[in-house]
From Swiss-Prot:
Organism per entry: Trichormus variabilis (strain ATCC 29413 / PCC 7937)
Similarity comment: Belongs to the HCP family.
Gene: hcp
InterPro entries, A to Z: HCP/CODH (IPR004137), Hydroxylam_reduct (IPR010048), Prismane-like_a/b-sand (IPR016099), Prismane-like_sf (IPR011254), Prismane_a-bundle (IPR016100)
Cofactor(s) essential for the protein: [4Fe-4S] cluster; hybrid [4Fe-2O-2S] cluster
Taxonomy of the source species: Bacteria, Bacillati, Cyanobacteriota, Cyanophyceae, Nostocales
GO CC terms, sorted: cytoplasm
EC number, as in UniProt: 1.7.99.1
Protein's name in the database: Hydroxylamine reductase
Sites bearing Cysteine persulfide, chain numbering: C400
Keyword Nucleus tagged: no
Function: Catalyzes the reduction of hydroxylamine to form NH(3) and H(2)O.
Amino acid sequence: MFCNQCEQTTRGDVCHQWGACGKSPEVDALQDLLVHCLRGLSQVALQAKSLGLATRETDEFTCEMLFSTLTNVNFSTSDFISFVNRAIALRESLKLQIQATGNAVIQSAINSFQPASDTQKQIQQGKDLEFEFISQSAKNVDIFSLKLTLLYGLKGVAAYAFHALELNQHDESLYIFFHEVLANLDAQDKSLQDWLDLTLKVGQMNLKAMELLDAGNTETFGHPTPTTVPLGHTVGKAILVSGHDLLALKAVLEQTSGTGIKVYTHGELLPAHGYPKLKQTHPHLYGHYGTAWQNQTHEFERFPGAIVMTTNCLMPPHETYKDKVFTLGPVGYPGLQHISIHDISLVIQKALELPGFTEDSEQKTVTTGFARNAVLGVADTVINAVKQGDIRHFFLVGGCDGAKPGRNYYSDLVEKIPNDCVVLTLGCGKFRFFDQNLGDIGGIPRLLDLGQCNDAYSAIQIAVALANTFEVNVNQLPLSMILSWYEQKAIAVLLTLLYLGIQNIRIGPTLPAFLTPNVVKLLSETFHLQLITTPEQDLAVCLG
């Protein structure tokens, strides 16, 4: 087993025996086998596109399958065997369509590959392909490092593109890019600079994917508005929806209407409360329960209702509560019931069987919904506060949360940020400090929750708008970005910021294990990318 795509990789190096996320060596091998089959499918898809053939099914499948290989999404060997078979079926179907046009299929070893019919042999094929991919770059570990960065970033882009296509937002250039990267991942004629340029293009494409998702979310659910969200609970039957999928949450809300069941969000679905067409249309969307993904084992155990897991981040469930957890979309785990977004009757049945909350709890609240439209709507107030010296500096403190030590840096940092500074946050990293009362500056809250990790798009739009107003570039704004990372979507977001030329980003709690010292040096020299140190030291530099 070789997996170093997340921040929690064993000993900060690579997972060899078992994934720190709970992924088995068998699933790891089948994920590598799936990616190999997708590479062959992409080669054929590109030829099909060049002939004007329709490839939308393949495009969408490629996005969803890359998404399924993200950290904490799918742990099911049977699912990945099914995915591999589907990839081959789509590939062969496209080949027949190409031949029907009178053209010969451009054959290669990758697009002629056939998976074994036996599960154990497929697992061995995956292990062999993993070793072959590593061996191809053995002579240049820096190129291998950038290849991994490219692939992991692409997985993050695929996650956002998948959510966007669910909302009927598509972009052909995005699909072509997926196929081009996968089809040429084994290229041996590219320099280190070539691979760096391609990696930064992942950032460019991720900006497009986040833009599509932003359009899909706002057109479907309205622009987020500042909304107070209760963190407590109320008496009654309950369903908890975790993950990131707003469309799945909408389906749960629609199908539970009139049942008396209250729906609660968990993890990165907290920002859902800010979308008018979710909150205002569905009054039984009651509040938010729990915190970030890594706390789910004890939070899910205590929740007295049914739980729906959408997209990532699923942890291996404990036996004590796995019978009330349901998976949806690309999420999978052996022994958990998988449901369709169109029929959640099993979830409703389970929620009605379980006791639900038997008493009301204390109603502490937080506020979410400060996306780009809300913030830019009060831009004049913000600008005047900066000009008058009431706001000295902005800090974007966000990203992924995680379980490894060192992440208390972010809560300590926010506590120490001076009172004349505003904190923007997004992603599940905010759960380190989301319930702190930081007060306001002239009516502007000092803590602004922009939304989910993909709402980095909002942060970018806000920064660009402020830069245009002050007639400077983004790097000249009184703005510091201090980010936490865990998985592949965070990699994609970081690559977007680097593609945009944003300098002096601080990341933590550790550097990605897949970055070699030379690649770290290259990124540091080019973009002044740096690792966090201590809250005191970093604040002194940012405000100096």
